[in-house]
Amino acid sequence: MEPTPAEVKRYIEQGLACDRIEVDGDGRHFQALIVSSAFEGKGRVQRHQLVYAALGERMREEVHALSMKTLTPAEYAGGSR
């Protein structure tokens, strides 16, 4: 069974404290905007690794593709959307 965007959002929220999260997708390919203080001081690859860690095995088994925009709260407030 393919996950819904709401389920992917919940999976990420369970493993990563998010200030804001939006997820869209078709059940196989998803796009996410994730705003988290956990991203402070981290580069893009490290931020994506945090999200992949939050998804765990689901990333391999349920989510086939995830395009992410990962921002700190300051970046989001500054308009880096």
Protein language model annotation of sequence segments:
Residues Y52-R81:
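C-terminal structural segments of small proteins and small subunits
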Residues M1-R28:
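N-terminal first-folded block
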Residues D24, L33-V35, K69-L71:
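Solvent-exposed beta-strand sheet faces enriched in polar/charged residues
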Residues H29, H48, H64:
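Histidine-centered active-site/metal-ligand motif
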Residues L33-Q46:
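A short interface-forming secondary-structure element
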Residues H29-Q31, Y76:
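Short, active-site-adjacent cap segments at secondary-structure transitions
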